[in-house]
UniProtKB/Swiss-Prot annotation:
Lineage, highest ranks first: Bacteria, Pseudomonadati, Pseudomonadota, Gammaproteobacteria, Enterobacterales
Compartment annotation: Cytoplasm
Matches recorded under SUPFAM superfamilies: CutC-like (SSF110395)
Keyword entries, A-Z: Cytoplasm
Name the record gives this protein: PF03932 family protein CutC
Family: Belongs to the CutC family.
Organism: Yersinia pseudotuberculosis serotype O:3 (strain YPIII)
Amino acid sequence: MTKLEVCCYSVDCAQIAEKAGADRVELCCGQSEGGLTPSVGALMQARETVTIPVHPIVRPRGGDFCYSSNDFTIMKNDIARIRDLGFAGVVVGVLDTDGHIDMPRMREIMSVSGSLAVTFHRAFDMCQNPMIALKQLAELNVARILTSGQQQNAELGLALLKDLVAATKDQGPIIMAGAGVRLTNMQKFIDAGIRELHSSAGRTVPSTMRYRKAGVTMCADSDVDEFSHYCVDGEVVEAMKSLLVMGAPLAKHT
């Protein structure tokens, strides 16, 4: 059966996702940056309170995926901490200046990861040649690739996603579709034989604060509403999981 991974920007969201039936959680912080490494406190709390597999992302900053020496050392330290805390997996990705998989650095990451299941994240969507990147990641023995099919959303990238699934039919990383995967379009991914889906399944909820200071923000973008935040919608997760269960006979290569 096709699995559902829910992207969670807090431990609260991870707990909601688990209760609603998610198969796995990608734990992040920094939603506006597209997902950054969660704090040590968040990692510890997730280990203590979430029982389904949790895969923290390791991404020290927003922007591109070509990192300085300091950034890379920080990433390895974070991966080692995640490994030692006993998580099931980790989500990471490193590219070189020419938009290829940085193989020397990824080999170091795989070594530090030990028994962690490694997901190569959407840095894959920034690669020059996706099929070459797929071959390289297979050589590294990564567990899965999170990808939108190198498009702005996974529905637009379905053609490449199907090619990637076909190329990994017999062996290689699991192809996990992500970016714009919703209840309304997920049947398309099931029909394409995609084994795992990644969704934030979320909504914006208002702050619980009654007093709201006007004219002062903590964000560089003063137009951002800081009295709201993004949260996993448990009802949406339940509905997505129900559709996956019903659509199980349609899912190929499971």
